[in-house]
Amino acid sequence: MKSILEQLSSITTVVADTGDLDAIKKFQPRDATTNPSLILAAAKNPDYVKLIDQSLESSRKSLPNGVSESELIKEAIDQVSVFFGKEILNLISGRVSTEVDARLSFDTDATVKKARKLINHYKSFGIDKERILIKIASTWEGIKAAEILEKEGIRCNLTLLFNFCQAVACANAKITLISPFVGRILDWHKVKTGKDNFSGKEDPGVISVTKIYNYFKEKGFKTEVMGASFRNVDEIKELAGCDLLTIAPKFLDELSKEEGELIKKLDENIQSKSSIDYEFDEKDFRLSMLEDQMASEKLSEGITGFSKAIEELEELLLKRFSEINNQKLISAT
């Protein structure tokens, strides 16, 4: 009998949520997603020190002589994300998602500039922009930046998405793909209610993604829905049939070892049609987010967490840069 993972792969595009190249080799997904926390975890792995060194060297060569260390490290953050993305693309047939610095989440212009820069870095390696999804936080400013980028042919993946309002704003902006989070919504409800067991269709994260998916299919939106941030395999099974699901290696492994029948829960050929067409201008969007305590808290928490991961990655790169310089000094004496 086919494993649950094999069955899932036949009805949903399975995406690996990792920067671990060995895990990608093992599970052979079509697409892969990264974020600052995943890149940081991979960068700490001694197996990838060569990749870090290449990123630092490339950054040094791309900047004029005499630039400050802070400018070099800022450039290296972009380069290391692209270097990991490049290596991932060598292992998959589809797309990789590379995230814009989360500290730019409330700056439309800076987000657009950073995204263009990342695409140009990929282009320097001969990688077509069709294979890249630029990940941007689902703030109002992020959605507006993505709307500009999409018109330039730069495809975007809007992340840290926790409610219906964010999703619809992305669809109306004709964004390529959204990543509605599941597990982080569950985390919030567990804390707020004191209830630990939200199983199957009762899982608030599953309910959120199902609502978004069904509305998108009812209205014929082209924006792809990729469920993300899972806490258990039951959440994944409840979203079988979703356009895409991005799954951490530990759950890919668990699903690959499990047998039994997987039931398709989401269907793009949905029969019921919603009579309501939702539109959110900036005022409506901000009010909706303000009124949604869960979405507001989780969006803020996510941006803060990814920002801290970038800062830690900067420290790691600076430390490695100093080590390389010291090695050169020793070799020269």
From Swiss-Prot:
Its EC number is 2.2.1.2. It catalyses: D-sedoheptulose 7-phosphate + D-glyceraldehyde 3-phosphate = D-erythrose 4-phosphate + beta-D-fructose 6-phosphate. The active site is at K135 (schiff-base intermediate with substrate). Coiled coil: none annotated. One of its GO terms (cellular component) is cytoplasm. It is an enzyme of class 2 (transferase). Keywords: Cytoplasm, Pentose shunt, Schiff base, Transferase. GO terms for biological process: carbohydrate metabolic process; pentose-phosphate shunt. The keyword Cytoplasm applies. InterPro entries: Aldolase_TIM, TAL/FSA, Transaldolase_1, Transaldolase_AS. It is found in: Cytoplasm. The keyword Transferase applies. Pathway: Carbohydrate degradation; pentose phosphate pathway; D-glyceraldehyde 3-phosphate and beta-D-fructose 6-phosphate from D-ribose 5-phosphate and D-xylulose 5-phosphate (non-oxidative stage): step 2/3. PROSITE patterns: TRANSALDOLASE_1, TRANSALDOLASE_2. CDD domains: Transaldolase_TalAB. Pfam families: TAL_FSA. Homodimer. Transaldolase is important for the balance of metabolites in the pentose-phosphate pathway. Belongs to the transaldolase family. Type 1 subfamily. HAMAP family: Transaldolase_1. This is Transaldolase. It comes from Prochlorococcus marinus (strain MIT 9515). The gene is tal.
